[in-house]
Amino acid sequence: MTTRIAVTGAGGRMGKILIEAVSLAGGAQLTAAIERPTSSLLGADAGELAGIGKLGVPVVGDLAEVVDGFDVLIDFTAPVATLANAKVCAAAGKGMVVGTTGFSGAEKAEFDETVTSIPVCMASNFSTGVNLCFKLLDMAASVLGDDVDIEICEAHHRHKVDAPSGTALSMGEVVANAVGRNLKDVAVYGREGQTGARERNTIGFATVRGGDVVGDHTVSFLADGERVEISHKASSRMSFGRGAVRAATWLLGKPASRYDMQDVLGLR
């Protein structure tokens, strides 16, 4: 069965990657591409926009206009836009794959309430490698526990607007849950000045922004005499695109619920 996929934010860096990823995937077809109502790209062919040749899918400025033409929406935009798109999808019974990060607490609560009636796969990172890292982090933290200091360092391109990255925060949550802590209670975001000795049982975060770094993440488990590091380095956004399309095809026909890439990959 072919999954009809819509991509929103079609003119953005990730939108173009997603369009290409859909075109390369078996069992998937791009049937809609959406941009802001004021975008100069409206009417352009989505395939030509992504640099892969004509697909016969024009970019439109209103999701509701094409909602009957797709099964699953892939949304890697911004919280406000994702919330608006969620309302349209929920009303029409369409599934969503969401890679948007940077939600405030209120925005996340509103999103969760909006999508209770549809299947949603939401993840901070759709890379297969990163999701394997989540599994490895759970194992490492469960074994090493309170015998180590835990630090998370991430690096991204200069244009990324949220910090730490959603992936870094997800890694922190995996580690915190594995050792029986609440990340909100133990996270330390950056250090400056006379900080004093490191508090045990905390999880530190460090952020780097610059250049065209797609995404680097390293979690260090530091003990006296040794350290264990689990790292992932993305060299292309296509790894995220392939994962998102895989999630979209997996989501077709699933009951209304909240899923993530651990479900898609069978890592639960």
Swiss-Prot record:
Keywords: Amino-acid biosynthesis, Cytoplasm, Diaminopimelate biosynthesis, Lysine biosynthesis, NAD, NADP, Oxidoreductase. CDD domains: DHDPR_N. The active site is at residues 156, 160. GO terms for biological process: diaminopimelate biosynthetic process; lysine biosynthetic process via diaminopimelate. It is found in: Cytoplasm. The keyword Signal does not apply. InterPro entries: DapB_C (IPR022663), DapB_N (IPR000846), DapB_N_CS (IPR022664), DHDPR_bac (IPR023940), NAD(P)-bd_dom_sf (IPR036291). (S)-2,3,4,5-tetrahydrodipicolinate binds at residues 157, 166-167. PANTHER family: 4-HYDROXY-TETRAHYDRODIPICOLINATE REDUCTASE 1, CHLOROPLASTIC-RELATED, DIHYDRODIPICOLINATE REDUCTASE. Catalyzes the conversion of 4-hydroxy-tetrahydrodipicolinate (HTPA) to tetrahydrodipicolinate. This is 4-hydroxy-tetrahydrodipicolinate reductase. It comes from Teredinibacter turnerae (strain ATCC 39867 / T7901). The lineage of its organism: Bacteria, Pseudomonadati, Pseudomonadota, Gammaproteobacteria, Cellvibrionales.
